[in-house]
Amino acid sequence: MAAQDQGFKSLRQLSASDKEFCFEMISHITSNLDLTETQLSQLKTAYRAIGSYLANQGGKLVECHIYAQGSVGIGTSVKPIDEDSDMDIDLVLHLPSQHYPTTTDEANELLFNLIRVLKDSQRYGDKIENMPKRRCVTLQYGGIEGQGFHMDITPSMPEDMDSPNHKSKVRVADIKDANSPSHPYGYRKWFRSACSKEIRWNRKSNYRSNNDIYAGTVEPLPGQGRKTVLQIVVQLLKRHRDMWKQNKQNVYGDCAPISIIITTLAGLAYEKCSNSNKEYQNPFDLMLDVLEEMPNFISHQYQSNGTVKYTIRNPALPTENFADKWHEKPMLPQAFKAWYTQVTEDLAKLLELDQGLDKTIERSREMFGSQATRGIQAKLADTLTERRAKNRAVVSSIGLGVSNAATATPVPKHNFYGDV
């Protein structure tokens, strides 16, 4: 039996109370990876100010629209392992009246012009980097509450000038290919739609909607809404990937799976679970099904030269293949397989029965880092005390008292966490 199959088997054999404890612990871990309310608010203010400044420069910038893409836009941000490292914030600067470049010279000119405009600003002149990246310019924003940030600003233009809105398909400047098709708004919309899909909970389940996830113990950011199972799973996998990548025993180096692949596979798997009409007893079982289904959305085709072409389609732009580099660099699919096997093995080891809470916390720290597990033991102990006070606690074989009774309380309709 494959290592990951054995891992899934052992995880599925956990008792109902252990599964509740496990997902509650995972929820606490991912909450430590979130941006704070202050950080989110100041970032939103910061990039809106950038948009206002650019719009005031006239010309093609007058009607520009700036918005967050990537993890910040879909509520799956993960703080860096090294707390001294900057966090990437991906922004799209849409230019509705600008034709997309058709040559690499035009792409270079567009990006350097954007740098020049920001250089002329007293506010941004010392923050903008002198050279563009392949598709964006970078603004070193500085720190908020001890966390450093830099903003990658990607200019986009309408693919069809008859549909200039940023909500349509776009082209982004690309100094190697002149332009690249993209649909960042569509991807964000797709992922948010996946998050909001209803799950069928068993009539004996404590859960009645996506929002009923330990509502009494996992605090959402005020005004940001409660995270869904899908967002929690993506954050967990991304942090595990980050830790796995820097492990000295990892022979794959920078070939670790990129975030867009992890996020897309998890989102597609979650949609399949929702559409299956399967009834779930708890979010832990849903998480396991999502993990197990992820590889099924990677297609492969053998080429005449003996190589394999892999495809992971962008749900918002099916012509885009997120695995396009896997064909050229065989280490990439090998790294994905190695990481995927490792994450299932690690989760099984983390949740081994009879190891006690202290050992579980120690293993979670090794797997996700000290930042992610900060305060987790106290949080779980507080939860146990609260449940015992209500005479609803039973003893988990993992070593923490957890409740078989309802632990989640209804919450309002989900307002997307990280909606910036």
Predicted features and spans:
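Catalytic residues for metal-mediated phosphoryl-transfer on nucleic acids/nucleotides
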Residues: C64, Q69, G73, G143, ...
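Short beta-strand-to-loop capping motifs
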Residues: L93-S97, Y270
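Extended, alpha-helix-rich binding/interface surfaces that flank or overlap catalytic cores
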Residues: H150-P222, A393, G399, V420
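Terminal (often C-terminal) interaction modules
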Residues: M1-T30, P295-V420
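Extracellular structured ligand-interaction cores
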Residues: D86-D90, R134-C136, G148-D152, V234, ...
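Conserved catalytic core of two-metal-ion nucleotidyltransferases
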Residues: Y53-G58, I74, N108-S182
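Conserved nucleotidyltransferase catalytic core and NTase-mimicking acidic/glycine-rich helix/loop elements
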Residues: E219-L351
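N-terminal regions immediately upstream of nucleotidyltransferase
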Residues: M1-D86, S97-L110, I398-V402, T407, ...
